[in-house]
């Protein structure tokens, strides 16, 4: 059952949606979440942000919770029926209960996207710095499962070297969604 408090607005490559993405970039900077979202240092400007998010194969969404802009997510590195998910919740929505409800609702919604061949995704993957326990533990609280640690799995631009990454995965089964 879908949570009616969640609305996910797909962000395509139109002028209006580019302006929404510019506003999101500005908010990430003002809320100081840009560097922890792009810990690898690849995004240093608005244009780099737009190029990354609007890259072919990326599925970006503006997240609304109870009618208010609550965050932003995108899915990329789509292979078969798997994709990597990335999430940013705006500060107004930080807090254990709200954030967990939103995260679980997003996982449920994306894992029930369908086309003529059935479900688009069977698994969503997430990889974060192991030291960012807040991020990967949130995914676990939202229904993901811990797969394990990948040695030197991410590049940490702040330290200028590779660091261990935590890999998590969420499926319809881990969320208890009947098929």
Q: Where are the regions that the model predicts?
A:
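Conserved beta-strand-loop-alpha-helix junction that forms the acyl-donor binding cleft
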Residues: 120-140, 153-154
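Conserved N-terminal entry element of GNAT/NAT acetyltransferase domains
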Residues: 1-19, 174-179
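A short helix-loop-beta-strand connector motif used in the catalytic cores of GNAT acetyltransferases and
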Residues: 48-62, 71
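Conserved beta-strand in the GNAT
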Residues: 62, 67-77, 84-86
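Conserved acetyl-CoA binding element of GNAT-fold acetyltransferases
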Residues: 76, 80-93, 127
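Conserved catalytic-core motifs of GNAT/GCN5-like acyltransferases
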Residues: 127, 145-162
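Conserved GNAT-fold acetyl-CoA-binding loop/helix
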Residues: 30-48
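Conserved acetyl-CoA-binding loop-helix of GNAT-fold acetyltransferases
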Residues: 96-112, 137
